[in-house]
């Protein structure tokens, strides 16, 4: 509970931040979060009797990356890397989920996600010899090919509990393959609510994903992410998903709602990058009320979340009554700068060292 209270406190501090100086003070206090990860990964390495060379080979990462984890407490940058660590170190299911939930703030292994289903099967049947991550990759690619050949299947859609119970009953690779193919429809639909929300924001700009990415000079990996999300029900990269929300001018509440649809935890100010993103989004909405109006226009007819829908309608009623904007188009024209551009400027002012992030802004 202490950790949870601290997280809430830090999140609240960021929401009240009025300058980059105050933000930097919060960032400087985040060292314990990275210290926890450093202690955790070093304990695992010691328990498994590995050196850096063996760890980098097992986790399919460079030696420099592994050294940064163990010496500096640098966090892995995406969920796939956490999967590499879990499989490389042959963690059991409980340990694997702790790794994902506590340190990655990613969802636990989710049986209704095809990649996770493969991971769950490999964990239950770790090969006696060889590379567990390679086994996972080969089985995943084979199943993706088989699913394309098989089609959606005739099986009725299963809920998460049903699919996970039946997954655990599959003993052979052949049985597992047959189960996945027969339930291909359930796997393809696992993230459809998330894709629906993202599409609402993109369509509001009168563009498809390709046009949105092209017009805003963004990374085409967003297009690939959306394709994988819709066609294969593939779990998106957490930071990339958050940054897509930023580029779509979503509020903090909307980004966190989107994360919940991806079965992920809300944004956490204990993570330095997420802390900066939270500051940028909160400040942008505070300085420019047009962002609130824009997102309210988009979500006013969104029935999947009645609470969010009502909040958006209340915002619109407030602004129309005040007569601040004559019509919707005037509001949208007023937004000359995306929050993504604003975030990029803040990161540059803070001399953010990880250049990879700028690819997505």
Where are these predicted regions, by residue range?
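Short alpha-helical "recognition helix" segments of helix-turn-helix
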Residues: 51-58, 208-217, 244
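Residue-level signal for the short linker/turn that defines the boundary of a DNA-recognition helix
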Residues: 50-51, 80, 207, 239
């Amino acid at each position: 509970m202490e950790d949870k209270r601290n997280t809430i406190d830090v999140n609240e501090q960021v929401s009240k931040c009025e300058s980059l100086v105050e933000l930097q003070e919060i960032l400087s206090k985040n060292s314990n979060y990275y210290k926890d990860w450093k202690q955790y990964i070093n304990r695992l390495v010691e328990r498994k009797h590995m050196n850096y060379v063996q760890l980098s080979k097992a986790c399919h990462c460079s030696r420099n990356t592994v050294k940064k984890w163990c010496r500096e407490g640098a966090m892995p940058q995406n969920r796939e890397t956490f999967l590499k660590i879990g499989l490389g170190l042959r963690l059991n299911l409980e340990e694997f989920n702790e790794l994902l939930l506590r340190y990655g703030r990613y969802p636990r292994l989710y049986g209704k996600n095809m990649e996770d289903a493969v991971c769950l099967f490999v964990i239950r049947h770790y090969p006696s010899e060889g590379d567990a991550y390679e086994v996972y990759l080969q089985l995943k690619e084979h199943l993706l090919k088989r699913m394309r050949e098989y089609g959606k299947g005739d099986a009725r859609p299963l809920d998460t509990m049903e699919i996970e119970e039946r997954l655990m009953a599959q003993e052979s690779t052949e049985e597992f393959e047959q189960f996945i193919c027969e339930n291909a429809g359930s796997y393809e639909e696992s993230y459809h609510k998330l894709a629906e929300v993202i599409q609402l924001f993109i369509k509001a700009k009168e563009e498809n994903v390709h046009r949105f990415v092209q017009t805003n000079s963004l990374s085409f990996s967003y297009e690939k992410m959306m394709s994988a999300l819709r066609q294969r029900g593939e779990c998106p990269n957490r930071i990339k998903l958050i940054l897509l929300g930023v580029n779509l001018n979503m509020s903090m509440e909307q980004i966190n709602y989107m994360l919940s649809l991806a079965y992920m935890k809300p944004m956490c100010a204990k993570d330095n990058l997420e802390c900066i993103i939270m500051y940028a989004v909160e400040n942008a909405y505070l300085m420019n009320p047009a962002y609130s109006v824009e997102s309210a226009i988009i979500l006013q007819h969104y029935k999947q979340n009645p609470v969010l829908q009502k909040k958006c309608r209340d915002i619109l009623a407030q602004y129309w009554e005040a007569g601040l904007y004559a019509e919707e188009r005037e509001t949208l024209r007023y937004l000359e700068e995306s929050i993504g551009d604003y975030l990029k400027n803040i990161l540059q002012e803070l001399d953010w060292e990880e250049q990879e992030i700028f690819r997505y802004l």
